[in-house]
Amino acid sequence: MAFLKLRDQPSLVQAIFNGDPDEVRALIFKKEDVNFQDNEKRTPLHAAAYLGDAEIIELLILSGARVNAKDSKWLTPLHRAVASCSEEAVQVLLKHSADVNARDKNWQTPLHIAAANKAVKCAEALVPLLSNVNVSDRAGRTALHHAAFSGHGEMVKLLLSRGANINAFDKKDRRAIHWAAYMGHIEVVKLLVSHGAEVTCKDKKSYTPLHAAASSGMISVVKYLLDLGVDMNEPNAYGNTPLHVACYNGQDVVVNELIDCGAIVNQKNEKGFTPLHFAAASTHGALCLELLVGNGADVNMKSKDGKTPLHMTALHGRFSRSQTIIQSGAVIDCEDKNGNTPLHIAARYGHELLINTLITSGADTAKRGIHGMFPLHLAALSGFSDCCRKLLSSGFDIDTPDDFGRTCLHAAAAGGNLECLNLLLNTGADFNKKDKFGRSPLHYAAANCNYQCLFALVGSGASVNDLDERGCTPLHYAATSDTDGKCLEYLLRNDANPGIRDKQGYNAVHYSAAYGHRLCLQLIASETPLDVLMETSGTDMLSDSDNRATISPLHLAAYHGHHQALEVLVQSLLDLDVRNSSGRTPLDLAAFKGHVECVDVLINQGASILVKDYILKRTPIHAAATNGHSECLRLLIGNAEPQNAVDIQDGNGQTPLMLSVLNGHTDCVYSLLNKGANVDAKDKWGRTALHRGAVTGHEECVDALLQHGAKCLLRDSRGRTPIHLSAACGHIGVLGALLQSAASMDANPATADNHGYTALHWACYNGHETCVELLLEQEVFQKTEGNAFSPLHCAVINDNEGAAEMLIDTLGASIVNATDSKGRTPLHAAAFTDHVECLQLLLSHNAQVNSVDSTGKTPLMMAAENGQTNTVEMLVSSASAELTLQDNSKNTALHLACSKGHETSALLILEKITDRNLINATNAALQTPLHVAARNGLTMVVQELLGKGASVLAVDENGYTPALACAPNKDVADCLALILATMMPVSSSSPLSSLTFNAINRYTNTSKTVSFEALPIMRNEPSSYCSFNNIGGEQEYLYTDVDELNDSDSETY
């Protein structure tokens, strides 16, 4: 809030603050602006209301002052008057229709302000004008909340008497009693309780009023609530009881009261902490701790992470409390889950007095903690020299390593405190001792850029060229982390060898380049020329073989965008076109990552622009175009020779323009087009940049291509134009632009691809309704052209009902009975795939339900053969499909359902059959449905057939009855026939005898060799549907692989 000087305000405002109505009247008469606003939008009326001057308020309003004017905080004059507890001012404002429901930016009404400021008389004037006294502010608090928080008993009584909801809660679910308890307003708490407030209510975090009172130390409220019998051990959402909360906040009087009333002193919260843990840690918890310990609190109780109260004192440096806990029987060397004792914790946080106390009490200074470290490790790592000194005085082997082989000197070197390091060195620490990774303290000092420690270690005789397990020297680590070069320079001056390579073949130059440390590179170059370092493998490496890395420092600097480091490198390294294992140059990597400065540096130094990598045969121009780095692209093209570099092709024939369009980089597309890129260049699949834009749907890129004359009807190797691809992918914006372009060239966009499919086929097949609608608006697509597997076939086979309906509405109902090259209608397609909605649509437009294809199959047969039960049910029930029809192999729909084991479909058909002749109808192999169902083990179908009079004695072309047809092969069938003949001897004239002997007559004629033919199996004609999900030959599967733009067509039928 800005404080303004009164003398700088208008005369009218000054007169108001002087309380002079006559002067105000005179100024108003002189046409002073009564609605003037200061820089916080406060008007003179706000000032009068703030002062509570009713006469001046009246005068201003009558002179045209806006009674509901809002300042920058949305406060009205009524808010101001109420805040000043001026009843007269409020009455005047209300008389002139001041808005009692006006809200400020905190959504507080004048009633909220009155409740907070104990303006009872003002509230009495406001309440009768309000429809609801329970309106809440932005925090969800009602006027009752504010009154309770402020401790205004009279206001609370008034609000309750006028219908205030005593249990209303704010956005944290806190009620008025929570706030009154927290603030210690005992009379208000009693008043609320007497009016039915819940004393055990909980907020969102399950804090009760007792928690609230305990946290703020309001003992009178605590006692009152305890007298009412509330549960003193009730946990909140974190498991903290009121005793926990009181200890955490250091409210010793409340703690004493709770303990006296029987609170559980060892109650654990969700993390396993007891009140004693909180008392040990909190700022003002000393007296609380004394009370807890004196009342039986367990000093060795552990939290879930294994910490005892003694750990907590060590963590927060509570020296006197640690003594109390130790005297009460605490275990000195108890471990937490990381294995750390209180001594470890105290050492880690540098609490010297606590360390003294713990050691005096017998703490083991040689006890291992996390990762096997001693307390001395932690003190040295954190740089607490006084703590180190105390721990050293206890006496133990200073070079004892932790679990990773690191000594205390390693820790001190990593921590960077010179005093700790010197203390350890003077005590005799071994500065050449290595950890399990082969690193000495000098490695750690270099890695952390601790110059003073590094200086001390080298001065003590530490080897500067020692290798760790990765083959790295301290110089490698300094090159990685040293931004100002001090550590690296000192190592170089002390004979560190910059040519030594690690096991990956990297030396200090590589590391400096990778992290962009220009100063380090300059320092190394001043010692040894960089090109010399790159040619040598190091010096005294154990292996004689050259272990140089395939990645050069130039690659590393370029890839990470360190152009300043790159500037140093290009001055010394002559081969700027050095390649990595995949054949990429530093310029390629810089262009790929979009590092313009690096690209500029390399080009200016003569790096080759048109060099191709080994794998994709791409140049840096391709790399920049792929990732949309337009600035890099302009630099590369502008400096490339010859000029046709803009259309350079990669291994797949792709130009930079194609890659830019493919990835939707409009800026790059325009840059390339402006440089003369061939807009119709083709790759090895015959696809142009426009084909790619059609597939990816990048409209801006497509527009740019069309503006530069791209041909929209160029065909790829499969005969597909960009119009085909945009329709197949559903990119309506791109399709519209292409159709418009075709129209402007007076070209026919309805051309078919190599398999006869038009864009309409593709759009229908993939269900892109908006594209279908757009294409059908073109007169040329309203003609039946292309593959006989029509767009309607394509739509229904993939259940694209919307597209199918558009086709029928636009092209007429006659298309529902169109046939493909194998005589199949759209109804066949819908039946094959069980798309009921499409089936219903076709039937509603008089599709011929009994039409047959070239194999004699009806849609019902197609559905029955493929087990499409929903379609079968619809066709036999709603569409009354003919059940007596037979295909070219004399199979009925019932035969086909049974032959494929589709029991449900067979039962649905059987349900509609009443003709016994149809039940016993035979196919070309003389098999009845009973033969086929029995052979396939369809028990329920067999039972139904028998119930409908199916003949059990009918014989097929092999002389087998349905019973014998159950045999898995002919040999078993003939054996079964022999057994049946022996079991049931009957006269030769009986039907059973003749049937049996027909089956076994080959056994009774000894002059012939027994030879059984295989039982004919129900099989489809070669032209049957194999997979109606594809369109092959004339019905090629409509499919586009957007990513590869190189799809394959599989035969369907």
Curated annotation (Swiss-Prot):
UniProt name for this protein: Serine/threonine-protein phosphatase 6 regulatory ankyrin repeat subunit A
GO CC field: cytosol; nucleoplasm
Localization per record: Nucleus, Nucleoplasm; Cytoplasm, Cytosol; Cell projection, Lamellipodium
Alphabetical list of SMART domains matching this protein: ANK
Post-translational modification comment from the UniProt entry: Ubiquitinated by the ECS(RAB40C) complex leading to its degradation and decreased PP6 activity.
Organism phylogeny: Eukaryota, Metazoa, Chordata, Craniata, Vertebrata
Coiled-coil region: none
Residues annotated as signal peptide: none
This protein's record includes keyword Disulfide bond: no
